[in-house]
Amino acid sequence: MAKPSAPVLFFNSLSKKIENFTPIDPERVRLYSCGPTVYNFAHLGNLRAYVFTDSLRRMLNWKGYPVNHVINITDVGHLTSDSDTGDDKMEAAAHKAQKTIWDVARFYTEAFWSDLKNLNIFNPTIWSIATDHIEDMIAFARKIEEAGFTYQLDSGLYFDTSRLKEYGLLAGHREAEGVGRIETVAGKKHPADFALWRRSSPDEKRQMEWISPWGPGAPGWHLECSVMSMKYLGEQFDIHTGGIDHREIHHCNEIAQNQAFTGDQQKTGANFWLHNNFLVDRSGKMSKSKGSFLTLSTLIEAGIHPLAYRVLCLSAHYRSELEFSPDNILAALTRLKRLVIAVGQLKKKVQKKVVADGEPDWLRAFDERSFSKGAPLDYQRGLIEAPLKKEALAILERFDQAVSNDLMLPQALPLLEETLGNKKLQPEEQLRLIASMDMILGLNLLHLDRASLNIRPKNASLQENNVLALLEERQLKRKEKDFAASDAIRNRLSEAGIDVLDGDPLGWEWRPEWNA
């Protein structure tokens, strides 16, 4: 199957403009994404970055490009300040929990992976763990030192940013936005200089430290991403993603390290640097530093399916701020439910035409996840789209144009909804279009059902068996025409957060309880 015709366009933070995307290797896109520092749970703002990156990867796969995707796990070196001050976040978390750093890292890494699974986010090709690459980091820093880009202080080995004429490309050389918010470390030649290796002080008791040419200590946070991206993707790869808060300091420092290591000012690490914007609430940017933040578990405990958060993310462009509020997440849940109901009804219409086992051959053969594991896209998309006619192909072309234009997913999701209501299409055409579109949107619409969206809130006063018993009693009262008793049971269920759905196949559902 030929690739869709729309060219892929991205806003490149490096050039500050929209550019045509052409991979370095036409056979494979190389993509690196900054991963979490695993000292705490990922909050919803953190997770927005991975919904964005997953959508990006899905779109590239859908367009015909296999993707070699690397995400790092930072389990050492990230200080409470993005510069070189404060405590190591991992050391501080371990001390507070009275556990080893390894135990803390393992716990929060597994929690993060669980969040990604709940959001239907694909695993990368490689999970790159920082502490597995310490020797690589030492060798990388040593080469930069030999090239004359460093100096030593009592606190460690520092990168001399004055050696690079174009330092701060991503920040546009705007000190007010980048350098201006870096705290000063005594002895640094310039405020923007940063640690490649932080030497342990003699009176410091650290759980994690390694022997190096600069004394025992730990790598700087910025060093980790340069080393791991280059190791797995090469000196210059296609795309680097991360949150917009990384753009002014962390990613500027990555670029500086890459240029110093290669000796080539043109080798910034990636041709395209893509940054997602913040998730905000009434108090501003969602942040762990505020001490109180919302996690995916917060939503699940409120009775909200995690894919409702994915719907919310799809409703705003990745470069725009996204507002989180109770009203917004509940509206996203309602939107998800409507989609699941509509797709379920559509599947029933299509299945009625199939004599064998109620499911079309193409639907049985289609595995939404297999295309991310190297399955040929011409098979996966060809399986779905081959029989589509003019009207359906026109919709698919509009969808292609939206997702190819800097990932305009807020335009793409309404096209899926429009397809569901399009009476000019045959039901099977509609379902085939939904299947193709959802390869990018990632809502698992062909497999979700309403029952899976019916989640009991953690603080609900009744257990499901109590609810079923009361519903059975209510049915009995209705048969006996004791409507007063029937209404009383309905009211009791409503007060307990259960909506009775007479005439609906589901019968009843939990009402989300939002107390955050």
From Swiss-Prot:
Residues binding Zn(2+): C34, C225, H250, E254
Key words of the record: Aminoacyl-tRNA synthetase, ATP-binding, Cytoplasm, Ligase, Metal-binding, Nucleotide-binding, Protein biosynthesis, Zinc
Catalyzed chemical reaction(s): tRNA(Cys) + L-cysteine + ATP = L-cysteinyl-tRNA(Cys) + AMP + diphosphate
EC numbers for this chain: 6.1.1.16
Sequence motif 'KMSKS' region, residues: 285-289
A Pfam family: tRNA-synt_1e
Keyword Nucleotide-binding recorded: yes
Cofactor-binding details, from the entry: Binds 1 zinc ion per subunit.
Required co-factors: Zn(2+)
Gene3D superfamilies found in the cross-reference section: Cysteine-tRNA ligase, C-terminal anti-codon recognition domain, HUPs
Subcellular location: Cytoplasm
UniProt similarity note: Belongs to the class-I aminoacyl-tRNA synthetase family.
Database matches in PANTHER family: CYSTEINE--TRNA LIGASE, CYTOPLASMIC (PTHR10890:SF3), CYSTEINYL-TRNA SYNTHETASE (PTHR10890)
Known partners and oligomeric status: Monomer.
Stated name of the protein: Cysteine--tRNA ligase
Species of the source: Zymomonas mobilis subsp. mobilis (strain ATCC 31821 / ZM4 / CP4)
Higher taxonomy: Bacteria, Pseudomonadati, Pseudomonadota, Alphaproteobacteria, Sphingomonadales
Annotated gene: cysS
